[in-house]
Design a protein with these regions (language model features):
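N-terminal alpha/beta PP-like core and its mobile active-site loop of ThDP/TPP-dependent enzymes
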Residues: 1-227, 231
């Protein structure tokens, strides 16, 4: 699958060494699946202290920690393996954020439930229709609409759809810093970037005067507002 990453580590030292990068992936909306090999089920149940573990044995400690830096986390057992793998992978694909799966040594050899797990990937058609109509009405009634693209267009692998939307609507477009290169910079309705601290009167004028700002995939952080301008830095 294009645009996704994966890493495999051992429990404890391995996963903790990688945890900083996983947290960074969450902050930057990067889809990475962290697969961690942990000791066998009996070792976990008996709280046997083996290498790479804390002396007060808790094989779930790192799993609990990863819940705070991933979109979904699972610790597999015989009873939950199929359901949890499907749940975590669904979140992985849908949200494009890092996820975590701890896999005990003996899980692969266990017989697990073959009960079918189904997830509904279909949008609520009525809600989708109502929202689409409201958005279309807002855009069609606008006198000075502007499209502003950003990071999540890239993260959700939607550049083609974004470019088609810009070209079909013929609405002037700009972007935040992380949305650079979403469309060709020589496109006739491209206003240039709208970045904090970098003066671009054309983009600033359009954004400040618009009556309909169409923000596509925005990530609002202090970087958008707080950088000093070249004039101030000088």
């Amino acid at each position: 699958m294009r645009g996704y990453g994966a890493l495999i580590t051992t429990y404890g030292v391995g996963e903790l060494s990688a945890m900083n990068a996983i947290a960074g992936s969450l902050a930057e909306n990067v889809p990475v699946i962290s697969i961690v090999g942990v000791p066998a089920t009996k070792t976990i149940e008996n709280k046997t202290c083996v290498h790479h573990n804390f002396q007060d044995v808790d094989y779930h400690a790192c799993y609990e920690a990863h819940k705070h830096v991933t979109a979904a986390a699972a610790f597999l057992t015989r009873d939950n393996a199929k359901m949890e793998i499907d749940r975590v992978l669904k979140t992985f694909v849908k949200e494009r954020k890092p996820v975590y799966i701890a896999v005990p040594l003996d899980i692969a050899k266990m017989e697990i439930s073959d009960k079918e797990v189904s997830y509904d990937w279909i949008s609520d058609e009525e809600t989708l229709r109502l929202v689409s109509n409201k958005i279309a009405a807002k855009i069609n009634n606008a006198q000075k609409p502007v499209i502003l693209g950003d990071l999540l267009v890239k993260r959700f692998d939607s550049r083609i759809e974004y470019k088609e939307f810009v070209e079909k609507t013929r609405i002037p477009t700009t972007n935040f810093l992380m949305g650079t290169n979403l469309i060709d910079m020589d496109y006739d309705l491209y206003l240039g970037g709208y970045y904090a601290g970098f003066e671009n009167p054309t983009a600033e004028k359009y954004v400040n005067e618009t009556d309909c700002l169409i923000a596509v995939g925005p990530v609002y952080t202090c970087l958008l507002y707080t950088s000093p301008s070249p004039r101030d830095r000088g």
